[in-house]
Amino acid sequence: MAITIDIDTARPYQVHVGTFLLEQAGPLVRATAGGTRAVIVTDTNVGPLYQMPVKQSLEASGYEVSICTFEAGEVHKRAETYVAILEFVAEHELSRSDVIVALGGGVVGDVAGFVAATYMRGCKFVQIPTSLLAMVDSSVGGKTALDLAAGKNLAGAFWQPSVVIADVGCLATLTPEQFADGCGEVVKHAVIADPELFAELEKTPLTLELLNRDVARVALIIARNIDIKRAVVVADERETNQRKLLNFGHSAGHAVEACEHFELGHGNCVSIGMGIITRAAALHGICDAELPGRIEELCARHGLKTRCELSADAIFAEALHDKKRAGDTIDLVIPHGIGRCSIDRTPLSTFHDLIAEGLGQKGDASAC
């Protein structure tokens, strides 16, 4: 089974969602990216599991294939890793018409994508996401990034892939914690754009048990999430306006991630960020008083955290590095209801107070 979603950006491409797609990578890459050489960029967790079927499929389609592996983890989404991959690609004499294949989760996709965006001022790029979070979110939309000492995703480029190949079978090797972490972005998509999906997830949560019982249903849920992101990205490819809706929970969430030294997964941090902002919105009467409870309950049923022990000052200090900051303001996604969110330009002092209120702490905006 396979579901195909057309992404009609300035450089259109397709996302294929289904099972047994790793073995079809070669023909799919050949048909969309071309070239004669391919470098598979992967990490120490994913490579041993999936690099061989992808390599063999690419070779059967006429590619000369090399594999570049780096240490797994967000802490390696750094300039040193990026430069090492660039050097590897150059040593293997890739041309601009050749292809870099990202095989892994969001970190692999971000780093490999930035390499593809900058090597020889841009070469072909393919995403093969193997985590739930990467399938429903980071592999689609063309964002690539590195983390800097000052904060998350502060260096990067927009670089759309030639094709995205999401083999749902790869999810079977995730731990329950890794699978749950990906659900943070699933819940986010439902909140910002799809009340029906939210209600379906309330009735039947997305879990590894569901994957084992009904892989076709999981594939449909993943495709639905991709379609939500597709609609937003196509309307605003460079994130000047509407695409910022996808950042619901991210300004506080990225700050939590940095405070936790990237030891807490991105999806959990987004879930915490959604909880903070929604609780604050309810206190101000922006949304119904019941909304925070609904979102927190759905997150909890997916194994996600919505609260943390960090101080508002600590989170705010990290959030000052957020890309959505503009001088003394920051663009925040504010929930009004399921499927109804707005992008509000918010003074930093107000943002600090919202964080404090969402944490149940007293506000003190003196830090800004």
Describe these PLM feature segments:
Residues M1-V99:
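ATP/NTP phosphate-donor binding region
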Residues G18, I40, R78, P129, ...:
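Residue-level signal for inorganic ion chemistry
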Residues L86-L103, A112-Q127:
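Non-catalytic interfacial helical region
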Residues E91-L94, Q160-V163, G169-P176, G184-E196, ...:
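Generic secondary-structure signature for well-ordered alpha-helical cores
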Residues V107-F114, M135-V136, A255:
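Short glycine/serine/threonine-rich phosphate/pyrophosphate-binding segments
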Residues F114-T207:
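A glycine/threonine-rich phosphate-anchoring loop and its flanking beta-alpha core
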Residues G184-V187, I286-C368:
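C-terminal charged capping/lid subdomain of soluble metabolic enzymes
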Residues T204-A314:
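Active-site segments that bind and position negatively charged phosphate/pyrophosphate groups
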